[in-house]
Amino acid sequence: MSKDVFPLLELSELVTCLQSCDFSLAVEENISKPSSQYVITLYKQIIDTFMGVSPDTLLSNEALFDNSGSNDIQQNPAYTETVKVLALNKICFKFFQDIGVSDFNMMDLYKPDSLRTRRLLSAVVNYARFREERMFDCDKFMSKTEFLLNQLRSKFDDYNYLQQQINKHRNEIELREGETFETLQQQNKHLDQQISRLKGLQETLNIDYNAYKSRKQSLLHDLEKFGFELIELEFERNKLEKHSKTDFNELNLNIEKLSTLLATQQTNLNNLEQKHRKLRISMNTFQTLTHELYDVLQLISTDLQESHLREANLIDMREQLLQTDQKLNNILSSGVMVKMKILQSQLDNQKKKLHQLEGETKAKQIENSETLQLLQRQYTDEVVPDLRAAEEQVENDLANGTIKNYDYEISQLKQAFQTEIDAIDLEYSLLSSHINRYMEEMLRVMVEVTS
């Protein structure tokens, strides 16, 4: 974000403002793609217009150059142009610093950038607008300054006249014949007194001149401060004018309408707060029931995870038995009877484990069935009555669209819960059938292997 105190103007507005200030060189094409020669010429015109100093006249003055230097160096065109560009850069830096741009440098003259040139010219336009707006306020300061300058010129005239008188008396003072030493001393004393008075007058003039410069700086600072204060006061005045033009009868009527509307809204707010409290009680009851349902579903999910784990163990055991069967076939095909006995013992152990696992599986199935029946009874005996009581309480308290939405969500939860129960029953039945088929298949395979 830019930290400048003036706005960055668009090219069209910038060109219009500069041309209105008699800067005929201000063209959009030249500003968008500035060259070194173009910006130097344009800045010279700006300095000449606003500072009253022509850079070409100032830089062409031979007194600006060092007379003690070499004549060859002074007559070198490159040296002369360099000094002129440096002097122009110094003048432009001081001017742009006074109007709010403190980073002007030599690159803005030699290799100008379109964005920086646009920024510098925006500062010039802003200064021109401010100067035009505040020119009337400066009239009294300019008149006072002119008066002080006239007094200063009068003092300098008096000083020059006294200096001429001193020089005249110095030339006339000569030793004349017949004059005594005492007469010369008296004349010298008289001249010393006049010189002392002149020195005092000179010091007074210097003090007055310094006071004038300080007063001038103070007045310029006050002018700038008063200008900003005037802008702020004008803004405040415009706001107060808007308020002063307001119709008080209409304002009182609007206040009465707003008061009536406020009372109505307050009544509606109280009714809504009562409904909100009742709805919060119903929501707390519903959340309690939801947590209980979540606990039931969590128990069912835990049982399903255990069943899946057992099924995975059975699948692993099946894989092991298939591997054992394959190894057994390899041993039988090789005719090694010793390995046959070892495998027979392993097979017996696997049968024992299988029978034991079958018993545990059946016991777990019975336990899961009992748990499921218990959960169903708890749901029927505890959850359903609470849900019905909550439904009756909600229907009695509030009969709006929000409660109907909650009824619909509760019915959806019931259906989802019933669907999950049916899915669990189906999964248990499928798991039992798979286990039974697997056990029968394993027994058949073992019988075939032993036979």
Swiss-Prot record:
Any Gene Ontology biological process: cell division
Record keywords: Cell cycle, Cell division, Centromere, Chromosome, Coiled coil, Kinetochore, Mitosis, Nucleus
InterPro entries, per the entry: Kinetochore_Nuf2_N, Nuf2_N_sf
Record GO terms (molecular function): microtubule binding
Gene Ontology cellular component list: Ndc80 complex; nucleus
Coiled coil: 157-368
Subcellular location: Nucleus; Chromosome, Centromere, Kinetochore
Keyword Coiled coil (UniProt): yes
Superkingdom of source: Eukaryota
Similarity comment: Belongs to the NUF2 family.
Assembly and oligomerization: Component of the NDC80 complex, which consists of NDC80, NUF2, SPC24 and SPC25.
Role played: Acts as a component of the essential kinetochore-associated NDC80 complex, which is required for chromosome segregation and spindle checkpoint activity.
Name this polypeptide is given: Probable kinetochore protein NUF2
